[in-house]
């Protein structure tokens, strides 16, 4: 009996479709944000001014993510660099998911697993355009996890070397990569079929490679005594004392993960819903690749090990973890779901799942193109990506150059949290550094800026910017303790370019004269 059931995809055809689709989405998710975002969000502005320092670390993370953005911006320009760099890391992540999927699934299901991750918030989605340490971590997390799988399977030293390199480099993006190393070590210690690898050179080659690659960072950390990023990683989350915190914190973390896991799982419904059987006129998919029991256990460890780590951290410490601290956990989600539940499906179901994934991604892309320009119309406060950064930078540099002919060396500002001075990165100052011709360096206090000091800013001079009219005296009084010669220049208003902006942006500017000027003024 003839049917309209499509034939299963060959491995070559599935690989070709993956490459074409991934490259197309990378191009679109680079072009559309570049064209519609008039400015960047805080994370990206931070990456720019940290990246231009070419340091090992900042007050929140290792700086390789920022350094790579600075490198790409030199070739692609400031406007396109964040989306382009994020797209490159997303491609690495998707390639790793594809290769991981082919270890467990036939070509049709492996392609469906990758396509489902097009709906993942930290890949080709809105958050994927927000180039930051989470985006780079996600890519190297799943990349190193795949390399480790091949190392464990083949027991070849070249794969162990590659896995160690993946973890060692991943630590330069976010310390969280160490959790992956811990999960792999625990798996190898617990799994009865793979425990014997400890008697081979492989795991020790991997460990030595990771440590060797990360040693320069450790040496820098010890020499500079700049441990702020370690403190940030350990304590950057609110805590609640008592049993309520220990109970509610992990539950809140789990609930916050639902927006991350639901889109990929919904895209897989045609496969998962039909997993219990097929119609008589449907052609089943061919047998999936031979998968040993240890491989399935490795996939379980890869998904649930990091999740249990975060839940234990949250429960034991009463720590309310942010949603993005779980973004790396779900990178193998679609592969796991299909490996466990996607049995007895058909090419038609796999094709429908892929179609849903593509439609979802293109709808989200269209939403970015339409809603971002209209955002000031609906939001009470001006979104940061509509902030008139170029205009503020031009204003600040004109104030400096009225006094001095040399480039503006330093710029400081109120923290984006609106907290105390030096509490967090300065939003206004970051825009001046990013868009100004002088590319001034940003100083945000000893716990954030490893590349400067109060003495250096005092010696070379600079500007301080804040939201005029809000806590003027508080900031200026705190500043004068470090910079006695501080002089308020004035308050200005800057008009956002968006026609939907409801009000102007008030900007206060104060001048920090160079120390040489102070000496001249005090000379008899």
Predicted regions and their residues:
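Transmembrane-helix signature of polytopic, membrane-embedded enzymes
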Residues: 16-20, 97-119, 138-139
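Membrane-interface alpha helices of multi-pass inner-membrane proteins
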Residues: 53, 147, 159-174, 209-212
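Hydrophobic/aromatic-rich transmembrane helices and adjacent perimembrane loops
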Residues: 53-54, 297, 301, 317-353
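Transmembrane-helix motifs of polytopic, lipid-linked glycan transferases
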Residues: 84-105, 119, 124, 142-143, ...
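Membrane-interface transmembrane helices that cradle and orient dolichyl/undecaprenyl
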Residues: 102, 107, 144-160, 341
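Short acidic/glycine- and proline-prone juxtamembrane loop motifs at membrane-interface regions
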Residues: 126-136
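Transmembrane-lumen/periplasm boundary regions of multi-pass, lipid-linked membrane glycan transferases
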Residues: 181-295, 306, 311
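Membrane-proximal, lumen/periplasm-facing interface regions of secretory-pathway glyco-
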Residues: 319-323, 347-409, 413-419, 423-441, ...
């Amino acid at each position: 009996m003839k049917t309209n059931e499509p034939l299963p995809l060959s491995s070559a055809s599935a690989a070709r479709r993956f490459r074409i689709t991934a490259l197309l989405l990378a191009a679109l998710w680079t072009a559309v944000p570049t064209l519609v975002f008039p400015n960047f969000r805080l994370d990206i502005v931070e990456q720019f001014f940290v990246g231009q320092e070419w340091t090992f670390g900042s007050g929140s993370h290792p700086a390789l993510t920022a350094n790579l953005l600075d490198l790409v911006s030199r070739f692609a320009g400031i406007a396109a660099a964040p989306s382009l760099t994020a797209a490159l890391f997303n491609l690495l992540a998707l390639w790793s998911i594809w290769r991981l999927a082919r270890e467990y699934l036939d070509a049709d299901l492996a392609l469906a697993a990758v396509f489902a991750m097009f709906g993942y918030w930290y890949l080709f989605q809105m958050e994927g355009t927000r180039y930051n340490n989470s985006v780079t971590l996600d890519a190297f997390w799943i990349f190193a996890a795949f390399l480790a799988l091949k190392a464990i399977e083949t027991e070849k030293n070249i794969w162990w070397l590659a896995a160690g390199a993946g973890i060692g480099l991943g630590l330069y993006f976010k310390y969280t990569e160490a959790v992956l190393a811990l999960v792999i070590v625990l798996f190898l210690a617990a799994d009865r079929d793979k425990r014997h690898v400890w008697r081979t050179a492989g795991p020790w080659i991997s460990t030595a490679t990771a440590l060797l690659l990360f040693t320069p960072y450790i040496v820098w950390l010890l020499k500079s005594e700049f441990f702020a990023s370690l403190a940030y990683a350990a304590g950057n989350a609110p805590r609640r004392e008592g049993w309520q915190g220990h109970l509610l914190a992990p539950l809140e973390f789990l609930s916050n993960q639902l927006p991350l896991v639901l889109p990929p799982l919904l895209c897989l419904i045609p496969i998962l819903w039909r997993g219990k059987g097929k119609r008589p006129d449907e052609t089943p998919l061919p047998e999936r690749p031979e998968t040993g029991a240890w491989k399935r256990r490795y996939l379980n460890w890869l998904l649930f090990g990091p999740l249990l780590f975060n839940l234990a951290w949250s429960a034991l410490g009463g720590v309310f973890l942010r949603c993005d601290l779980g973004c790396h956990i779900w990178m193998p989600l679609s592969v796991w779901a299909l490996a466990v539940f996607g049995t007895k499906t058909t090419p038609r179901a796999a094709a429908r799942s892929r179609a849903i994934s593509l439609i979802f991604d293109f709808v989200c892309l269209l939403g970015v193109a339409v809603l971002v320009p209209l955002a000031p119309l609906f939001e009470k406060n001006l979104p940061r990506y509509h902030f008139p950064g170029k205009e503020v930078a031009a204003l600040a540099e004109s104030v400096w150059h009225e006094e001095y002919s040399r480039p503006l060396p330093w710029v400081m500002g109120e923290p984006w949290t609106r907290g105390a001075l030096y509490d967090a990165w300065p939003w206004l100052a970051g825009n001046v550094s990013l868009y100004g011709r002088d590319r001034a360096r940003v100083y945000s206090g000893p716990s954030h800026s490893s590349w400067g000091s109060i003495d250096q800013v005092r010696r070379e001079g600079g500007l301080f910017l804040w939201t005029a009219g809000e806590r003027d005296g508080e900031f200026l009084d705190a500043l004068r303790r470090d910079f006695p010669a501080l002089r308020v220049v004035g308050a200005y208003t800057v008009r956002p370019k968006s026609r939907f902006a409801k009000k102007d942006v008030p900007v206060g500017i104060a001048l920090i004269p160079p120390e040489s000027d102070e000496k001249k003024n005090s000379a008899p």
